Amino acid sequence: MHNAKGLLGRIVRDKLWRFGYRRSLCSLKLTSEDLDYQVLVEGSGCSRTAILNRPPALNALTTHMGYRLQKLYKNWEEDPNIGFVMMKGSGRAFCAGGDIVSLYHLRTRGSPDAIREFFSSLYSFIYLLGTYLKPHVAILNGVTMGGGTGVSIPGTFRVATDRTIFATPETIIGFHPDAGASFNLSHLPGRLGEYLGLTGLKLSGAEMLACGLATHYIRSEEVPVMEEQLKKLLTDDPSVVESCLEKCAEVAHPEKTGVIRRIDLLEKCFSHDTVEEIIDSLEIEASRRKDTWCITTLRRLKESSPLSLKVALRSIREGRLQTLDQCLIREYRMSLQGLIGPMSGNFCEGVRARLIDKDEAPKWDPPSLEKVSEDMVDDYFCALTPTEPDLDLPVKLRESI
């Protein structure tokens, strides 16, 4: 009877995937077993693999996934029989980030506590990963965006492939680069972090390797072979895991026309103190060079939320001087402002225009950079109210281990 029930559950779930519940499973009456199905587990030898498993939604993260990842990773960290941990995604994505359409509906329904819980569960897992005591391998074989970068970059090893697409596209939907992005982006070479955070434009797997976001690169068809080699390891030594990865890894060269080849130009344009100065500098270079890259970059900046651009620039600059936990605590405040606070209309408008109505014509408020005041930006970095608690991270406990 139990086996028949399990088989029926799998059939129902397969039908849900096939018939296109693409945006969110949060609104369905799901059992705890159904929710656990969003993060599967594989075990072999002394390794465990967490599999993000919402393929029709490109493995977008939910609150339950954040909690489940925390529970699994804490148990694995404490288990002396487990030496290292891996993470990968089902289907054609690693992870497209947080389930922003579900967040949009939570915002429009007026569910602030559920929004708080989402960010708390996700950011707490990211901190756990960033302080994890065992080697961690993230296999980024596909779309890796937004929160998907947050649940992978803080780990020990990140394997990119020819199918990897990296981006932090939050400003285009009226939000800010979060999930630890202000820490991760701010530590990239030169002003690459400012470019990625403000424009949300993409990097390839080879570009990720070149700038340090990835530690290794492999062709996607070789990923199963690499996984099998890793699963044979009986170790908790990161150098042994690294040696295995390096035996499977390949040399990758970024495209000659890509952004990695333009580090000097990024320094020239994105080192300015304000978004207005950055745009002015790009416009000068575009007129001088007649370069399609400059034109594409300018167009993307002008399509993004003016407030989000200024917030993102300040966030990345602050992140350069902060630890991961400080960045996550600050980003938590910012995320609540962006979804619950007085300026949350930009997020709703961005998601509506890009993902709901898809008219690609968001009406930003303020509508232009010159109308974004310093007070507006300052408010984005403040707690919602004087009594609003900050994100509670176990900093003393984790850093004393």
Swiss-Prot record:
Output the Gene Ontology terms for molecular function. Answer: 3-hydroxyisobutyryl-CoA hydrolase activity
Asked whether the UniProt record includes Metal-binding among its keywords, one would answer no
The transit peptide extends across 1-26
Please give the name of this protein.
3-hydroxyisobutyryl-CoA hydrolase-like protein 1, mitochondrial
The organism encoding this protein is Arabidopsis thaliana (Mouse-ear cress)
EC no.?
3.1.2.-
Tell me the keywords, alphabetical order: Hydrolase, Mitochondrion, Transit peptide
Among SUPFAM superfamilies, the record links this protein to:
ClpP/crotonase (SSF52096)
Compartments it resides in: Mitochondrion
Q: Which GO terms describe its cellular component?
A: mitochondrion
Q: Which family does it belong to?
A: Belongs to the enoyl-CoA hydratase/isomerase family.
